[in-house]
Amino acid sequence: YVEILKEELIPAMGCTEPIALAYAAAKAREVLGVLPDSVQLQVSGSIIKNVKSVIVPNTGHLKGMEAAVAAGIIAGSAEKELEVISEVSEEKKSAIRDYLQTVPITIEHTEQGHVFDIVVTERCGQDYARVRIADYHTNICRIEKNGTVLYEMPLLDETVQEDARADRSLLNMQDIWDFAETADLRDVADLLERQIRYNNAIAEEGLLGDYGANIGRVLLTTYGNDVSNRAKAKAAAGSDA
């Protein structure tokens, strides 16, 4: 169970699909070595569905795949992985907007047998860099520059992928209950304390700011501040933000 928690509770700056796009774009920019003058994005259907209308963090409320890619290129730090755009200055935010206005970013739907699939190709003149992420958000499986493969990791089929991860057959109500009752909290304290901090922070931001449909704030103002409603409101506010 501890290994499952470690695999699942990975910090990300915002909704993970657009952040994965930003990560791929930042990595391709790093490999290319210069600012690209055109970008091609090939993504699976699930990426399109989950990113199309989502606000990209630290961009001044820009939405969608193009914004995520531009943010990664202009302001991304690939070594931070899912916190790739956690630090974006006002100057960089302006540069992201300018980049979106001046550089063509094309999007193509592709299905290569993986539900989660992102390929970013960035070009400058005759040079190009290409990065592919597949199966999960930080899984860079191929890096290519000007026809030379710099890194490649064969993608596993779904059965092999599951075998490589912590055993999920434990995820039934009885075993989960037994773990909750008998676990040594020292094994999970750091993970859960971090999760509490992050979840509280995003919930408070959702209540204070103007995000999405503002469901969290509506619940509080309409139904009051009792414990039950406050729990619902904070969960909704975290989702809003």
Locations of regions flagged by a protein language model:
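Short, Gly/Pro- and small/polar-rich lid/capping loops
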Residues: Y1-I19, Y23, R97-Q101
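A short glycine/serine-rich beta->alpha loop
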Residues: K6-C15, K49-G60, D240-A241
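Alpha-helical support elements that line or immediately flank enzyme active sites
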Residues: P18-V34
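Solvent-exposed alpha-helices and their adjacent loops that cap or buttress functional pockets
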Residues: M13, L32-L35, H61-L62, T110-H114, ...
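C-terminal catalytic/substrate-binding lobe primarily of soluble NAD(P)-dependent oxidoreductases
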Residues: I10, S86-T102, L192-Q195
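Signature of multi-pass transmembrane helix bundles
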Residues: Y1, L100-A241
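A structural-propensity feature for long, helix-poor, extended segments
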Residues: P36-K80, K93-I105
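Hydrophobic alpha-helical scaffolding
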Residues: P11-G14, I55, T59, L82-S86, ...
